[in-house]
Amino acid sequence: MPSTRNIETHNDSNPTLRALSLSALGIVYGDIGTSPLYTFKTVILLAGGGTPDVTTIMGSASLIIWTLIIIASVKYICFALRIDNDGEGGILALMSLLSLKLKQKPFIIAVGLMGAALIYGDGTITPAISVLSAVEGLEILSPSLKYYVLPIAITILITLFAIQSKGTATIGKAFGPVMAFWFLTIGILGAREVIQHPFVLAAINPVYGLNFLFSNGATGFFILCGVFLCVTGAEALYADLGHFGTAPIRCAWFGLAFPSLIFNYLGQAALVLEGASTEHNIFYMLCPSDFLLPLIILSTVATIIASQAIITGAFSMTRQAMQLGWLPRLRVTQTSSEGYGQIYIGVVNWLLMLATLGLIIGFGSSEKLAAAYGIAVSATMLCTSVLLFIALHKLWKWNIIKSGLVAGLFMIVDASFFAANLTKFINGGYIPITLAIIIYSMMYIWHKGYKTIAIKQKEKNITVDSFLDSIQKEGVVRVPKTAVFLTSKEQDIPPTLVWHVKKNHVLQDKVIILNINNLSIPWCKPGDQLQIVETGAGIWHAVANYGFMEQPHIPKLLKKLETQGYDINIKDITYYIGHETIFVRNVRHTLSKYIKILFVFMHRNALPMSNYFHLPPESVFEIGRQIEI
């Protein structure tokens, strides 16, 4: 289990803390760490481009610095990291925690799912804009190389997505040191300019940012779109909590990432104050010409690492959604035995690749991609702030005024950024929003469809006593074998068991009726994973408990019964599972009909139960049945 919540990391001399902090630099801070490649340039362009005046430069730098302080440092580092679901973070984990302990489930779930869906929308743009902005440095090296930027970026991304199925555990060990070198490099490049123009340090005063924001009318409002790009990776601070723990993430942020980012943004501001052209990438202009090519290579590697973190995060969130019952079963492949987070989901990988390549080809440059970037992640952050308010008030027991003052500040800032980013909707912002709506709809349809099936199954429930009476009256022959019947929690006796007895008139002398119970916590304690009770006549009711970060493996779990003294041979088990064919009856309401048809389509294309639960194919017996919805 990769969670490090039980590791003592409070002592700064602890080597574990240093190692985890280094790893966190590679996984957690890739996205936010590569934002200097395009953020300051975008802000200056939104402010009018050309040769900006001192007020514009200082105001832009001040807004970026204070956005990093309020959103990344205070909201996520100081508050969000302290609200975990058994050590796990992220909007789905927070949603599960609140819905488990509080009564406002529909609202909490709606906000959480929309936030999660929006992350997918953002995930398609991040690899595209990151890699493209890095490779665009070639244009500064030689203007004739601009024709190679797009092909190189496309090649890099295709290669990145293609190797996902092989796993990235080995090269992943280098992510931390590479990103540490990246942060040191961008910090030093920025510090060089700050030392030469110390006046730029005045931008740390928030008055510069506020004056610039409120004295420029609509322009000041639009500039927030560019400013927000500096924190687009902040949600990862929270989502990766379970992989590293609070202390390493904070140590990596305040120890290296945050000061390096501040110095780099101030350095870019100092460079423009000096009169540098804003037509080219300001970030690369910080670098001496002799070191430009190595910096371009380093930038490209850093953006690949940032993209890898987004892809891995998409896999992890998809698994969480499946386990929580919000997405259909998909094939999850463990690519490394060293880390549970090293997984691969083919459908997600290839859909992300197609969307990312489509964006690169469609927009053609990082400057144009910036028009589509930010709207989805700003909406996600607003959703997180809403859930944080509920957590502060209900879980921490803060009074509503205190909760409102803290979370209200975050919501005002997030809402301002979201409103500003909405102006990008027509210019490309509609793409991630549309994608988020599609994914949210899929989650809603899947959950609603399975809820409908569960209600129907409950209506046809057969009690254990009535089943035992029936097999006794009919004189069913018992054979010396073991059978496992998978069932839902709505049923005492699964239809597959009833059908088996009715058609074959025989029943194994040892029968386990197994219910898979997906919990709203990330990890189930080993001692609670399998609960079994004998109901009589050689029939046991068992419950297999799995957290939303765990991958069910039924044979491995049942093997525990052998070690606990049960007379069961795991190699002698026959697994009986239902193969449902869902069909839609005549429905007058068109919308309801199409929702059900979409559910049927998703159900038919879901991974078979036997594959998802890792059942041995030679020991599986599928029993078909039709269900009308």
UniProtKB/Swiss-Prot annotation:
List the source organism: Legionella pneumophila (strain Corby)
Q: Which HAMAP family match?
A: Kup
Spell out the molecular function terms from Gene Ontology.
potassium ion transmembrane transporter activity; symporter activity
* Keywords annotated in UniProt: Cell inner membrane, Cell membrane, Ion transport, Membrane, Potassium, Potassium transport, Symport, Transmembrane, Transmembrane helix, Transport
Membrane disposition:
Multi-pass membrane protein
The text of the family note is: Belongs to the HAK/KUP transporter (TC 2.A.72) family.
Q: Name one GO cellular component term.
A: plasma membrane
Which segments cross the bilayer? Answer: 20-40, 54-74, 106-126, 143-163, 171-191, 212-232, 253-273, 291-311, 343-363, 372-392, 400-420, 425-445
List the subcellular locations: Cell inner membrane
This protein is called: Probable potassium transport system protein Kup 3
* Its biological purpose: Transport of potassium into the cell. Likely operates as a K(+):H(+) symporter.
Which reaction is recorded as catalysed by this protein? K(+)(in) + H(+)(in) = K(+)(out) + H(+)(out)
Pfam families according to UniProt: K_trans, K_trans_C
The highest taxon in the source lineage is Bacteria
